[in-house]
Amino acid sequence: MFELLALNAAILIVLVLIQWAISVKINDVSFIDAFWGAGMGILAVASWLHVGGGPGDLATLIMLMTAAWGFRLGIYLFLRWRKKGEDKRYKMILKKDREAGRFAQAALTRVWLMQAVLLFMVSSPAQVGILASVAPAPITPLAWAGFGLWCVGVFFEWVGDWQLTRFKADPANHGKVLDTGLWRYTRHPNYFGDFAAWWGIWIACAAAGWGYAAATVIGPLFLSFTLTKWSGVTLLEKGLDKTKGDKYADYKRRTSAFFPMPPRN
């Protein structure tokens, strides 16, 4: 398995270097967000294609779960980048390096390679679960439980993103706070969806063996930390507090930050 994981890592590095070269050419790394999901989908498909002895049903289930989640997110974020242009987060991260003429080096070391390491780590349950599920590995009740949690996750993420896109597309909503639909029950249904989807994939990985699950639990744990404490809820709400003011403060008072809950009066 280690040789196949190394092969996945090599595939990832090649893809990252190609995209880094493109980002230097266009002077913008923002499309890396689209590769976060798509890259995980690619690694899942690559793992499935080189399962020694052929993939079992469990491997196919994990691959499809990861690919569906990853490619949908990748397309969504790529289209958003094409519409909005360079992301201000990356503009700030690379501002000094760009002014000093070190954009190419900083884009590689501070953005692309760091993201590649995190991508590989977060997607480790999918990669290992697939590679460990050699035919005729069946889909067990535990795997179906993981699939059920994944379904909850993708519902919240996909519907949440759709509702937010529709809300922002209406000029009448400028300056307003989305507090209907799934956004009535959690301030971040898309982030919660990511959380649930990847814990579902990890549970499906556990169906291949609890040893594999223990070895890869760092993936969903790190993603959970990222979504709730690092670059997800915490970072986004700092900006929303400034731009939305009292409207967002009232929304925060009424609405659960992460896990879906009935709104408070």
Which sequence ranges carry the predicted segments?
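Short, N-terminal intrinsically disordered low-complexity segments that are rich in Pro/Gly
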Residues: 3-8, 21-31
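Hydrophobic transmembrane alpha-helices
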Residues: 3-16, 39-73, 77, 119-163, ...
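C-terminal ends of transmembrane helices
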Residues: 17-28, 75-80
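Short linear sequence motifs
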Residues: 24, 29, 69, 83, ...
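Membrane-helix interface linkers and caps
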Residues: 25, 45-60, 78-97
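Juxtamembrane helix-capping/reentrant segments at transmembrane boundaries
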Residues: 26-41, 85-110, 176-183
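A general boundary/transition motif marking the beginning of the first structured unit of a protein
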Residues: 81-82, 105, 109, 228, ...
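Active-site pocket-lining segments that scaffold enzyme catalytic pockets across diverse folds
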Residues: 111-118
